[in-house]
């Protein structure tokens, strides 16, 4: 990163502001962010911490909508940063840079009234593609009757992660009820004893949700760190071209500071090392 040059430019701008328009010297910088609902709890914690660290001189406007929405907003220049819970895709606009900031994982989940200890990869595929539609066909299930399958909408990066890592590249059946956010999916599964869905770790490990093992491996931080659980992906900060100025400073802080790492470790998984940006 162009750290020395950036600091020099910043120093010159501040000096000019002090000389020409003193009142503007303390104007706050606004960084706008939109995108993934899965990463929103993490981004909220990180931006609040950074805002306080900068004594209020950096202000964040954060909105949700889904990973693809954040990516599109960043490409269109509508926001400073797009939050993504999936890696770059061939269909994404050109010129984007994806900066990985943390790892997360996806769990198959059910209602606590129907705790299912484990499903094989074949069972997960059969249920979510609509080939198995009744709980009586699922060993270990206590529920009987039709399976209520829940999914995320097409803009969700968590859907991409689930399909690519736990569904073998297959698509979730169109009969599934689609939820627009992780919070809505979580609430739907909590309320429906016949439900099965998938959630990112922050929402899956919350009270009122039962996680399902995959091929004999529990969906847990320990198994992800050990490399035995498959449903893992990264959260990304996405910018139109290489990040610069205050946006670059924020992303660098997220990727490198001890304070950010501590926040990430609270509910997510830090990157093993600072990885280079992925050019989309």
For the regions a protein language model found, what residue spans apply to each?
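Bacterial N-terminal signal peptides that target proteins for export
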Residues: 2-12
């Amino acid at each position: 990163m162009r750290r020395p040059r950036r600091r020099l430019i910043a120093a010159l701008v501040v000096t000019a502001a002090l000389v020409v328009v003193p009142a503007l010297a303390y104007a706050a910088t606004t960084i706008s962010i939109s995108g993934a609902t899965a990463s929103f709890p993490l981004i909220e914690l990180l931006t609040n911490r950074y805002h306080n660290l900068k004594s209020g001189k950096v202000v964040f406007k954060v909105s949700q909508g889904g990973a693809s929405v954040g990516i599109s907003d960043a490409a269109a220049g509508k926001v400073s940063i797009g939050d993504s819970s999936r890696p770059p895709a061939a269909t994404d606009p050109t010129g984007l840079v994806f900066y990985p900031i943390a790892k997360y994982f996806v769990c198959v989940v059910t209602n606590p009234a129907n705790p299912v200890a484990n499903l094989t990869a074949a069972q997960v595929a059969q249920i979510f593609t609509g080939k198995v539609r009744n709980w009586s066909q699922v060993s270990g299930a206590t529920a009987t009757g039709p399976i209520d399958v829940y999914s995320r909408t097409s803009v969700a990066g968590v859907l991409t992660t689930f399909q690519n890592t736990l569904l073998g590249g297959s698509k979730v059946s169109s009969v599934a009820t689609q939820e627009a956010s992780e919070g809505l999916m979580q609430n739907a599964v909590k309320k429906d004893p016949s439900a099965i869905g998938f959630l990112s770790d922050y929402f899956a490990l919350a009270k009122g949700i039962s996680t399902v093992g995959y091929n004999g491996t529990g969906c847990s931080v320990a198994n992800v760190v050990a490399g035995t659980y498959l449903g893992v992906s990264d959260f990304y900060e996405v910018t139109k071209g290489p990040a610069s100025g205050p946006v670059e400073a924020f992303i660098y802080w997220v990727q490198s500071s001890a304070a950010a790492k501590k926040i990430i470790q609270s509910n997510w998984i830090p990157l093993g090392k600072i990885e280079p940006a992925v050019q989309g």
